[in-house]
Amino acid sequence: MQKTTFQDPDQQEELDRWQCKDFGSRYEDASTFVSNKTIFVVCGCGRSGTSLLRVMLDTHSLLVCGPESLLFLPLSIKPEELYKKFEVPLKDLRSWKRRCASRAEFALHFQEAYLALRERNIWGDKTSRNIHRLEQIWQHFPNAKIIHVVRDPRDVVRSLKTHRKRKVVDGQIVPTGWIQPLDDCIGRWLRAMDDALHFRGNSNYMEMKYEDLVLDTISTLTRVCRHVGVHFEEQMLEFHTVTSRSRDARLFPQNIEATQPISTASIGKWKEELMVEEVEEVVRRTHDYAIKLGYTL
């Protein structure tokens, strides 16, 4: 099959990330460093609702969960990017990168600093692609509470087709106009399920449906909070009223909607935006996993 050539080279880079082609073996953490601190990890296939859950949890008085840190992915640690997203002192970030013998140790220093900065008790990392790194996360943070956000694959694929919908150019959010190949969209969802569902049964792993989060918000957040080890707080429902660095849309331009009030408008949107033959292909390839997740296609 002839490879598609995209007008915007960033689009191919995005598709490569979906397949984790940017992961580098030299950035793998082969150390024996272990932290027994409780942390939580929000992850899942992109466009499943991880950012919405992230800002809700970040509104809890005891929890902190900022934009994607990428710290658990085998990528180069970039202090400047972390400073821009989290406002942890740049000199400290650079110092840890020089001194730490492992990225897990760096992550521990980072979480302690960010917790102190935000005056919270438990750090959470929301990076969608952590879904491909659960075993590695538990290797260094055995008490990590994994929250796997899942969603009807038809809606995920529908959303992935135009991802990334926006990018930041000269400090401004602008549309990309991208249309992604259906095969890549389905493949990304399947890859996430391949890498996560065999951890079912692990007491530190839970699944949460996006649909439950927006249709039965309090019960769903109560279950998530219990998994993390805290009580649900009513203020979590007011997540969209919070203004802070962690909610700056320029730091996560693909997920601007996550800072707005809860809406059910995206449920079933595939019916309007996917062609019949596309729906048939999505159902054919995702059916078995979807049934396991409790979806009827």
Label each PLM-derived region with a short phrase:
Residues 1-108, 117:
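PAPS-dependent sulfotransferase catalytic core
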Residues 1-41, 161-165, 169-170, 178-179, ...:
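PAPS-dependent sulfotransferases, especially Golgi type II membrane carbohydrate sulfotransferases
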Residues 54, 111, 134, 221, ...:
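Generic structural marker for isolated residues within well-ordered, non-membrane alpha-helices
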Residues 77-87, 117-237, 242-261:
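PAPS-dependent sulfotransferase catalytic domain
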